[in-house]
């Protein structure tokens, strides 16, 4: 907006300096301003809110992944057409890949709705109770479950002699993509996290863990990481759908103006919440069965094809 206003002022200044006929100059200035008002009104009336998952939706190639050129071009065109584009991810902001942070998204719904950011300003953040955060480690140990705490600035890992293979992969990925933030551990005196993921094996007591923590958390069963079970643990009341609602209310929009894009089971809350729901061609079967449109896989220009299908670019 600041750039647009500066551009208008520059055009007006140029017009005044070049045109000696003051009446003609004023008429030209009014035309410039009217064109601007019409353009912004058109964009505002036709603006849509686009929400994208990250892994498997915007990022291809596994971990750490990359954003295909066709996707970058499509996102830029969507913004140029006046649409707002948002990340809506299970990842907290501290675990966002650099490829995502480098792109000028208009906002973020992070950590399954635990934080909502718009134009660089945090609109909402769920603060976990301090005593609850520090009580979790003993419950996890009792239930023989391994976990990663995910925060806005850092992720926290257990100190264990035999970490599950996916935990090691997550730790290595975090180390590669978050060079400015050191790896932290559960015994850190300050635990600043919003949600966490858990992994289980045949020795884990998942039912007991659910029973001990269900008062405070919801559980999202994710795809199996054979031979491990994998769940996201999110504060009650937080979800990707709830993050969308917060943005919609803040902007005075409606769910009818929203389009959501995902591929995984943790996207189901938003995919079933919004009419215009798009599954990537590489999505899991449960996701494919719960969306209004299926596009091609991310590596085959899935985002660009979907945006074209809906007339967004």
Regions picked out by a protein language model, each given a short descriptive name:
Residues 145, 150-261, 265, 270-273, ...:
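Conserved acidic, metal-coordinating active-site core of Asp-based
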């Amino acid at each position: 907006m600041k750039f647009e206003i500066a551009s208008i002022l520059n055009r007006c200044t140029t017009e005044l300096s070049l045109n000696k006929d003051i009446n003609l100059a004023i008429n030209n200035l009014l035309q410039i301003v009217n064109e601007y008002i019409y353009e912004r009104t058109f964009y505002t009336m036709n603006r849509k809110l686009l929400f994208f998952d990250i892994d498997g939706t915007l990022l291809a190639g596994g971990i750490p992944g990359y954003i295909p050129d066709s996707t970058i071009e499509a996102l830029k065109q969507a913004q140029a057409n006046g649409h707002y584009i948002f990340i809506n991810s299970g990842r907290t902001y501290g675990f966002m890949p650099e490829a995502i942070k480098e792109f000028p998204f208009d906002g973020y719904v992070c950590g399954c709705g635990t934080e909502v950011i718009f134009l660089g300003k945090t609109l909402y953040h769920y603060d976990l109770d301090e005593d609850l955060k520090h009580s979790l480690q003993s419950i996890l140990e009792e239930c023989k479950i391994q976990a990663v705490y995910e925060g806005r600035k850092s992720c926290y890992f257990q100190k264990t002699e035999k970490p599950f293979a996916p935990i090691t992969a997550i730790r290595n990925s975090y180390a590669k993509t978050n060079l400015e933030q050191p790896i932290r551990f559960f015994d850190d005196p300050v635990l600043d996290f919003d949600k966490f993921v858990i992994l289980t094996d045949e020795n884990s007591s998942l039912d007991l863990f659910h029973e001990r923590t269900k008062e405070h958390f919801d559980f999202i069963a994710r795809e199996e990481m054979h031979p491990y079970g994998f769940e996201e643990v999110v504060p009650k009341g937080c979800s990707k759908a709830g993050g969308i609602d917060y943005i919609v209310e803040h902007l005075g929009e409606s769910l009818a103006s929203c389009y959501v894009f995902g591929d995984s089971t943790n996207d189901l809350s938003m995919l079933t919440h919004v009419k215009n729901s798009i599954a990537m061609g590489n999505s899991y079967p449960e996701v494919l069965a719960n969306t209004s449109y299926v596009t091609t896989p991310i590596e085959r220009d899935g985002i660009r094809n979907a945006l074209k299908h809906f007339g967004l670019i």
